[in-house]
Amino acid sequence: MSLPIKFRAIFLIFGIVAIALTSGALAYQASLIPASRLINPDELVKILQSPRSEKPLMIQVGSHVLYTQAHIPGSEYIGPASSETGLQSLRKRVESLPRNKFIVLYCGCCPWSHCPNVKPADDALHAMGFTNVKILYIADNFGADWVEKGYPVGKGD
């Protein structure tokens, strides 16, 4: 499944903006997240398709525009975790959950090493005591690493 050219352009623009905004902001780079906390797209799809697997709460922590264009079905949008508003939304969404709840965070706005959203979201959940958090490893962007690989896609809010 090939992504329409306008979506590719939007992913590229958001990637460039994210890189520009986060250059030098090493504390928020996804590359600082330990490999043990990552999950690959194929692993997540197997979990979602298995009738016996515990289904995670999936939270998109990036741009609303990207979420409405394409997201993982069943995932929830809470806002960019690079902003305090997004982090507050994340905390509010999970505050009543058991601390061992299986949660998957993802963004996909730009190349992994420059993502401004997944590291703050991961840090916030771990600071709250969550112990079963995984970050979806998206090497380039959501379009290339999820949509174009034919994984399930939802659209709209």
Range-by-range predicted roles:
Residues 57-62, 75-78:
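Short hydrophobic beta-strand that contains or immediately precedes a catalytic carboxylate
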Residues 35-50:
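A short, well-structured juxtamembrane/interface segment
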Residues 52-58, 132:
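Short active-site oxyanion
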Residues 49-53, 96-99:
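Flexible, charged surface loops at secondary-structure boundaries
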Residues 2-38, 68-157:
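Rhodanese-like catalytic fold shared by cysteine-dependent sulfurtransferases
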